[in-house]
From Swiss-Prot:
The keyword Repeat does not apply. Pfam families: HSP70. The keyword Glycoprotein does not apply. The modification Phosphothreonine is found at T199. InterPro entries: ATPase_NBD, Chaperone_DnaK, Heat_shock_70_CS, HSP70_C_sf, HSP70_peptide-bd_sf, Hsp_70_fam. This is Chaperone protein DnaK. One of its GO terms (molecular function) is ATP-dependent protein folding chaperone. Residues 600-638 are annotated as: Disordered. Induction: By stress conditions e.g. heat shock. CDD domains: ASKHA_NBD_HSP70_DnaK-like (cd10234). Keywords: ATP-binding, Chaperone, Nucleotide-binding, Phosphoprotein, Stress response. Belongs to the heat shock protein 70 family.
Amino acid sequence: MGKIIGIDLGTTNSCVAIMDGNKPRVLENSEGDRTTPSIIAYTEKGEVLVGQPAKRQAITNPKNTLFAIKRLIGRKFRDDEVQRDIKIMPYSIINSENGDAWIDVKKQKMAPPQISAEVLKKMKKTAEDYLGESIKEAVITVPAYFNDAQRQATKDAGRIAGLEVKRIINEPTAAALAYGLDKGEGNRTIAVYDLGGGTFDISIIEIDDVDKEKTFEVLATNGDTHLGGEDFDSRLINYLVQEFKKEQGIDLRNDSLAMQRLKEAAEKAKIELSSAQQTDVNLPYITADSNGPKHLNIKVTRSKLESLVEDLVMRSIEPLKVALKDAGLSVGDINDVILVGGQTRMPMVQSKVADFFGKEPRKDVNPDEAVAVGAAVQGGVLSGDVKDVLLLDVTPLSLGIETMGGIMTSLINKNTTIPTKHSQVFSTAEDNQSAVTIHILQGERKRALDNKSLGQFNLDGIEPAPRGTAQIEVTFDIDSDGILHVSAKDKKTGKEQKITIKASSGLNEEEIKKMINDAEANSEADRKFEELIQVRNQGDQLIHSIRKQLDENKNQIEKKELEKIKSALDELERSLKGENKSEIEKNIQNLLNISSKLTEINQKKSEENLKKEDTSSESKKDENVVDAEFEEIKDPKK
């Protein structure tokens, strides 16, 4: 069995890890970094840039540089959270035919899983470059509070990237695996507080250690899938925009280039204020009016930032209370608090969490890497490389169906350990009813329409009977990824209908296959582009070398020979401007053949120079020899 890699597909940054022997290892990407910005850019030349290269060009290409796509994955366009993002994102979020939130990039409609797949492809290539082998399987993490649609969309992204997603696991659970794997013996109850770039989760996890076999059991989970570092950045950006407007009377919101510069500066300032009390946001030539260029220079203190985001930090505290209550525990029952996600580096976040739990969070867990490490551990468990670890995760939200009167009747309650299966018998609501519609819901509200609709299907062919007579058995089956399978069966006729919830918001099989094919085609195009660049570099180096040799030896080359070499140089230079790899290779070979005499002369000259240097150094050695006269002294004893 090949390696199963662990991927933390984050809102702001992503990370990939593997099991190296019995130890997890976080891998460095092609830029030499252990985390990769979850940023994808589509350039004018048709290139797709991922990570740091995409981030670097964001200022000049804001509308086609996509970030925080995880906030849109598995979501409907009409969702309140999406409507909020439309107002602040520089790129265009549109309504797709099935009601999903999609993105318009250069007049091409793209689904969030298709865009996220580009980040996963980079993670896959990072692992392949390190291992020197093809990678086909992965464990991918998601926020614990992701619903069925968001989990399914994440699996779709994996498939589009050419990965078989062996398991979807919750981010806090993965962090607990990373934390608990090398800890000493003994049972512990931990709280994992995960505040990332776009999502927030809290999980209460019990680690049982019996005869060196560790069981990680999630007791409860809660969270907010639209709360994270991006929201903190937005608050600071808004403040800077308002301050600049007060000073200069210009609203920067109308300038996408200025807003992209401001976004980068705000993120940098926020990070600096985790260690400094004050920082300057200094952006010269941010914009201009009829009076000339304008510069932005605003001082921001840590206390100012804290006042801007305090309500966001407090929004994370309520889920902590709910999770503890659901787990049947009090604050005193928690042995350790683990902080995960880059936003937890903010001192205010750390102090509020410490105040709530009455203890300082642990500092020995890397908040940026723990989730990927845990995913790699789970990959090791699935491949058999890691023994004595059992993971018992939960479903974050209740699952049920709509029943008479528009009520949601739960079949599986939130925080139920998965995989799980539950059946319940329902009956018809009207006389002689020949069909029933099973409307599947996810959420905690009593009124059906207040919950997330996951999909619906019909069970036809029910024998006519008085109301309440027919018996319809509905079964909910959740697999290890938290994906739901539903069946409905007429107990009298044995007629059955099944559905795997693909979510009412989601990609159909045809769309996924098309995106997989597109990704494979792009992969081939990427490979060809890389080869073209390598050949161009070879050509450039050869031109530089031959020109240098010509300058040094032009008096020793016949005029006719010289013209041939210059013509071949011009031909190669011309082809380097084009896209034809085979033509460049042909011209490289042609120049090598024509300039062979020049190369011989140059080599001969180099050899002669070396001989001269050797002779010169020998004579210098001789100069340093001191002549001395020796007198033989005879030993009188002999």
